[in-house]
Amino acid sequence: MKVLIVGAGLAGLTAAEDLVAHGADVTVFEARDRVGGRTHGVEVAPGRWVDAGAAYLGDRHTALHEQITRLGLKTTPTTMTGDSRFLLGKDGETRHGRFPPLSAVALGEMFDLLDELTAAVDPVAPWQTPDAARLDTLTAQVWASEHLRHPDARLFFPLFLGEMMAADPASVSMLHVAFYLRSGGGTRYLNAFEGGAQQDRVDGGAHQLCEQLAAGLDVRLGTEVLGVVSDHAGVTVHTGQDGHRADAVVVAVPPLLADRIDIPGLPHRRAGDDTGRGCTVKVNLVYPQPIWRDHGLSGWSVNAEGPLLSTVDDSPAWGGAGVLTGFVTGAEAHRYGALTEAEQREEAVAQAGRIFPMLPEPVAVHVTDWTSEPYSKGCYAALFGPGDWQRLGQHLTTPHGRIHWAGTETSTEFFGLMEGAIRSGHRAATEIIAEVTNEWSTLR
């Protein structure tokens, strides 16, 4: 059995590994000059790497933990020891824990409303959720204007969506928000560090997962797939002037990229006109050491104004540097991404200094703009706009002939996370193995 994989991220490489284990001859095509997809690392000191892409995981991410253990990698807790900083008004405030200096009653009511929506979502078929048609035509911005009365809730809601989903409330459907939160384990789990989805990091960076998976596979870098043709006998994958024949193919790239592949006869698009890209620019500010810890601070901050809408301590577990990672998300990511490199550095360094006045000049600033990355089309994941779940939902995982789909956007569990990507890869491989097994049984 010959299988081709489009995309060398966690989903594609997981599917490839599973298929090879079942005796398949597998080739992986990757348009970039590296493997990893939306995982990516930057070296901040000799032998010390941190995540410029996907980074965090929790105890419920069982497939990811299994992969980490099997590959001999380790995790380290996300550093949250110390006080947090909040710049939500004219003056900054330092306080213990992560709860912002806003009305606890107002934010509690906001989270209760989100929990009610989340609990009602059909996790397998969100488009069949009660009241799905209305929720899917409603943007998160409109929902907030109708349901959030307190100014503190209205201030915090877009910051929350930016942190959780890299979403601009004006462009994402409320059904998608509810599904995303349900898929990720619920509002509080997805938002939590200790005991939540952001509890740990992979020592040395999550990009190592894909690098180790790829080491034992036939991976063709710099090879963009332009077309896929499925027929009764198999598939042909076109890369430039070359055609590659196989029994099946797994397309494991984000919907906006899959939509660019010419697939004759595909009855439904992989993305809609209103499907957005996760709006994220990740800024790794590198210092000689995590000096904020000496001042009793965790490195965590939440800020009403950009570019850095939140920060976290991502310093390597074994020392060598202090790394403060800033997240530029939502609409702010578009503004910041349009700046020059010098302007981006200047703004990030200046704001980090306002949040943490004890900071020295950084030794390096690494800016990774996922919104403009041509072979990702955003990060953390695609954002479904008004009507997208109604139009696209039931087709996200349905094979088209011998074409199968993977990627975190096709996962009903942990959509948008590394865990979702890995689970989708396992699912796609299982589909192909079952399909071939059934064909062999029929021939007998």
Predicted regions and their residues:
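Central helical "cap/lid" subdomain
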Residues: T223-E224, V229-H232, T236-G296, M358
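Conserved flavin/dinucleotide-binding core of flavoenzymes
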Residues: L13-T14, H22, G97, G234-T236, ...
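N-terminal Rossmann-like FAD-binding beta1-loop-alpha1 element of flavoenzymes
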Residues: K2-V28
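Glycine-rich FAD pyrophosphate-binding loop
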Residues: V20-A45
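Generic structural signal for small/hydrophobic residues in well-ordered secondary structure
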Residues: E30, G36, I68, A144, ...
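Dinucleotide-binding Rossmann-like beta1-alpha1 core, especially the glycine-rich loop
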Residues: R48-A120
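Active-site/ligand-binding neighborhood in enzyme catalytic cores
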Residues: D122-G227, H232-G234, A252, I261-D262, ...
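Glycine-rich active-site loop/strand segments that organize a redox cofactor
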Residues: G37-L64, A120-T129, A178-R188
